[in-house]
Amino acid sequence: MAKDIKFSEEARRSMLRGVDTLANAVKVTLGPKGRNVVLEKKFGSPLITNDGVTIAKEIELEDAFENMGAKLVAEVASKTNDVAGDGTTTATVLAQAMIREGLKNVTAGANPMGLRKGIEKAVTAAIEELKTISKPIEGKSSIAQVAAISAADEEVGQLIAEAMERVGNDGVITLEESKGFTTELDVVEGMQFDRGYASPYMITDSDKMEAVLDNPYILITDKKISNIQEILPVLEQVVQQGKPLLIIAEDVEGEALATLVVNKLRGTFNVVAVKAPGFGDRRKAMLEDIAILTGGEVITEELGRDLKSATVESLGRAGKVVVTKENTTVVEGIGNTQQIEARIGQIRAQLEETTSEFDREKLQERLAKLAGGVAVIKVGAATETELKERKLRIEDALNSTRAAVEEGIVAGGGTSLMNVYTKVASIVAEGDEATGINIVLRALEEPVRQIAINAGLEGSVVVERLKGEKVGVGFNAATGEWVNMLETGIVDPAKVTRSALQNAASVAAMFLTTEAVVADKPEPNAPAMPDMGGMGMGGMGGMM
């Protein structure tokens, strides 16, 4: 296929038009008084959102060169979202400012490589200063503030803070759509996995359709149990102890299941059988997790163990087990704390090494089940459109909060970027490098300027006043007041601000050093069908 090629100034100008189109659509959402953007959907109602990355991903431009520019900035938003989970609009605003300022200087004759060096120096200094001024997040109220700022909703802030307090920093917090209007929190403490009872005859509470076992023994195996003789020795020992039994196996079927059910109904003993969670290697790992949590052993042929040789000493124990049709929850396992900590450390190490997003998610789930628990925020709204928008905002707030726990918080509302201004301005450089540093300095002003513009104010006036204020004092666009941002609870996670700045600078530097752009030539439109000259079906009667 033939290619269309543009060089130097013409190439950069074409791409800049795409950058501006995308950034102008995204930046209207910045700040407490930012607006929404409506996205058309091929099916169903349109999506209304103020989430930068969602808007950026939707934008496709007709001109191939403009589209390439737009896609470069969309990558800034996407990468920031992957790393920090929020701050995508800030990243887009920073990228646009750096690209525009940079192009002015390249057009005026500056060397792009010199500009790139200056930009990299300035961003490195800014990030070091951000680390210095960031404060560790402490207590439930600080977490609530971070979440409330991101979601622009105090109620959501409180919910997320409560969820993190209950399940810990390693716990998993997921979002689900509620059937009602209200947004509420549901916390599952202990280890839960998605396998229910093998037979409904095993339930102990017919109203709730669940089996509750108090202080049970737990038999854990990766084998299929179809012959009752295999587990008879250990079953007799459990009956002598007068305790209920939970069996976790690959499957319990045939004669073994029938015998267990009959004896359960007769009242001989209280037993519930469930299938082992997961598949393949993940199943082995999850069974090992359950064994460590409950102080038991996995009875597997790989370790030379068979079910007939199992004793009560090789069984796990827990304070309580609740089994429903779909889930099993093990609460208060009596496993050795040191072994549990070692297992958590092992999973954390795997988390750092893995590159697969799916594996990362599954490892995070396993970590949460061992370390804390799982919290579910059920998002409610009056309409489906509002529900989607609300869910996106809460997702951002959740990511923002996790980022704050990792690297601490800085003053929000773009104030922290202005607080590193002096540090960046003090870098000694000459020529094009100095110009590169000035490009970053100009970009650092842009988020504050845009927040003020979205609030209906003159951005330049706010920026100039902020330069003269003490560190930490900023402009609260929601109220129009000048306040101490940290004390007022207007904060941003340091990780979000850092990622936005790094990713924006990276793409801007690449953009400025571009000298040629190659795109596919648009295919010519196919010629129209010739006129059939009145050849109707009537003239084809002889073919019948």
Swiss-Prot record:
GO terms under cellular component: cytoplasm
Subcellular compartments: Cytoplasm
Stored InterPro entries: Chaperonin_Cpn60_CS, Cpn60/GroEL, Cpn60/GroEL/TCP-1, GroEL-like_apical_dom_sf, GROEL-like_equatorial_sf, TCP-1-like_intermed_sf
Catalyzed reactions: ATP + H2O + a folded polypeptide = ADP + phosphate + an unfolded polypeptide
Subunit structure: Forms a cylinder of 14 subunits composed of two heptameric rings stacked back-to-back. Interacts with the co-chaperonin GroES.
PANTHER family the UniProt entry points to: 60 KDA HEAT SHOCK PROTEIN, MITOCHONDRIAL
Name of the protein described by the UniProt record: Chaperonin GroEL
Organism whose genome encodes this protein: Bacillus cereus
Lineage: Bacteria, Bacillati, Bacillota, Bacilli, Bacillales
Protein encoded by which gene: groEL
